[in-house]
Amino acid sequence: MRTTYTYNEGINFLRAVSILGIVLYHIFPFAMKGGFLGVCFFFLISGYLAAKKGQIDWDNESFHIRKYYIKKGLRIYPALYIMVMAVIAFFTVFHQELLLGAREEAASIFLGYNNWWQMLTQASYFMKITEHSPFTHLWYLGVEMELLVVWPLLFLLYKKWIEPRLGKGAIWFFVLLAVASVFAMGLMYHADNVNRVYYGTDTRAFSFLIGVVLGLKEDDWNKKGNILFQGDNGRALFFASLLVTIALFVLVEGEQAWLYRGGMA
């Protein structure tokens, strides 16, 4: 019997909250100072879905790295190409001065290393947000593409070698990777320049990895009938989490030290 994926409707709500936070941050950067944290939710969702779908493909004996890469490429590149070309065309006509270095930046976008390109060119996200740079936000896609390249290799290692030896304890492989990412962010943080830890794939991977852990363990938690996430307890936890998220979106500032010393996790 083939295993199928049942879509979690809560993901749509989490995406909506994340998008709202990010959009409001870009429209009102001084009023919605912490809206950029919505990006963390997108990485978490990506990791969760990667784990759920990876596990289903594994159970159905249909997990193939080559097919995975082709599928992801076909999902990302057509829309990305159209968007980048449309933006370049628009700014060529109306704001050509904002396209200085566009060729190098476009190459970094299509090759999936725009986050590192922005880091190396000292393009601070929190400074550029008020300058309306057309491609500032694509650092996120760079991190996402790099994580999606590494993910099937990690998953194959997990299923082929770690899980057969450690059983249910194998999940600690991803937990420890997430912890290492959080520690890396804290260790590499410098108050005068947060670019390295904000844009770095290694220092942003923890959100994706937390999502992976949630995706791989969700079925086990459901089978155990975990009352923490059910009924009144679940609703109370949901509203408490929503209030905390809204508070963070309003109160947090992008260059506060505690964020990079475990706060984003």
Q: Where are the predicted features?
A:
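Hydrophobic membrane-embedded alpha-helices
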Residues: 2-11, 17-265
